[in-house]
């Protein structure tokens, strides 16, 4: 699933057999590298509160989960149409990452990147998990278009989630779907103490918050 020519990665020893028939170990390496750079760019705000080293440690910890994403992604890709089961692999790893450590780190779920996007309305049917699966399925379909085989399946993997998202939008915000309205004002409180366990202090943060309905 690497849409670049061999010569582009030859200098890194990633061309040839490793690129066309990657091992689970190679997939884990790709997954970790992608995850590390992703979280290093995504989480610098954490460093503003806890310092640079805890921020880097958190990014590395989050990237460790991508080892499983890459390794199992390579394994399922060996099946016929196995790449299209990859969204379930991604979702499973995302669930574990959202549960541990420190009570989970769900702020980096893929679904949050689809807010106001064409797939966001799917959350009304299956929550952020369905949005994540649909997003990864579209991505797999786009990559699979570069392959000579299974292009019809690839097109279906792109069109079906997008079509489902458009259908879901129809039922969002309609009068028939609205029971009542409420105006809410909220002031979010801070954590009692700094540190990487801030996600475990949910109840304390709620107690320090002011919510008016």
Model-derived segments and spans:
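Membrane-embedded alpha-helical bundles of multi-pass enzymes
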Residues: 1-175, 206, 211
């Amino acid at each position: 699933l690497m849409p670049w020519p061999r010569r582009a990665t030859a200098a890194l020893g990633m061309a040839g057999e490793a690129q066309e028939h990657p091992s689970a170990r190679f997939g884990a390496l790709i997954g970790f590298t992608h995850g590390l750079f992703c979280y290093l760019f995504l989480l610098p705000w954490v460093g503003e509160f806890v310092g640079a080293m805890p921020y880097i440690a958190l990014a590395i910890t989050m990237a460790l989960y991508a080892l499983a994403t890459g390794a199992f992604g390579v394994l399922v890709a060996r099946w016929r149409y196995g790449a299209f089961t990859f969204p379930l692999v991604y979702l499973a790893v995302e669930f574990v990452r959202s549960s541990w450590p420190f009570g989970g780190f769900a702020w980096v779920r893929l679904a949050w990147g689809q807010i106001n996007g064409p797939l966001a309305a799917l959350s009304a049917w299956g929550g952020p998990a369905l949005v994540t699966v649909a997003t990864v399925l579209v991505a797999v379909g786009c990559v699979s278009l570069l392959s000579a085989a299974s292009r019809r399946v690839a097109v279906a993997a792109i069109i079906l989630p997008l079509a489902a998202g458009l259908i879901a939008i129809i039922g969002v915000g309609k009068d028939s779907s609205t029971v009542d309205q409420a105006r809410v004002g909220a002031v979010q409180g801070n954590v009692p103490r700094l540190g990487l366990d801030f996600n475990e202090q949910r109840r304390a943060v709620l107690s320090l918050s002011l919510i008016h309905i």
